Amino acid sequence: GGGTGQPLDWYEYDLMENPYQQLVVWNPDAEEILGGYRYILGDEVEFDKHGKPVLATAHMFNFSEKFLKEYLPTTVELGRSFVTLEYQSTRAGSKGLFALDNLWDGLGALTVIKSNVKYFFGKMTMYPSYNRFGRDMILFFLKKHFSDKDGLITPMVPLEIETDPAILEKLFCYDTFKEDYKVLNTEVRKLGYNIPPLVNAYMSLSPTMRMFGTAIN
């Protein structure tokens, strides 16, 4: 999962007057935490004196008036997510298979409790150590199939794709998500990498997902 890497993972947005909340997945039998999400409800977001939303992503992205007025009130911003080491599939075996599903169940429960929620918004992290060509393929693929044509949210300092666009256009030349995804999965694996789990998960969850660009955090 994401986080600061420090023994205590909190920051200013956990301590402000109207802080982010924590969705926690709990195993009642073992009495232990499986994972969690940091989140804030859009209709509870406050604005600073410049009219800018007080959000963890506000230092990286510009939010259009259309997004702030028409989308934010029915949106949940998702922050750091994690699955505890004991429940990560590489070391947990069968009990780790459903940890991520349990997180989705928690988000689903949140939409039942807060019936006005229509959208989830947040960032997915790709670390600098990830293969650059692999990263460029993923970004190109996401932009092709999930682009934000309305300009709802834009990165302040966009991270540009370094690979020649002609190479990527030749690779991802199909009309459907499914066919292009096969290419993406195959080519990334050739590099000795996997598509990051959350990227895979979000793409599979919703065909109406939008990708708002890439920024350096």
Protein language model regions, located:
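Short, well-structured beta-strand/strand-turn elements
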Residues: G3-W10, P207-I216
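A short helix-loop-beta-strand connector motif used in the catalytic cores of GNAT acetyltransferases and
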Residues: L15-V24, F47-D48, M209-R210, N217
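Short amphipathic alpha-helix that is part of the acyltransferase structural core
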Residues: G1-L41
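Acyl-donor binding region in acyl/amide transferases
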Residues: E44-T214
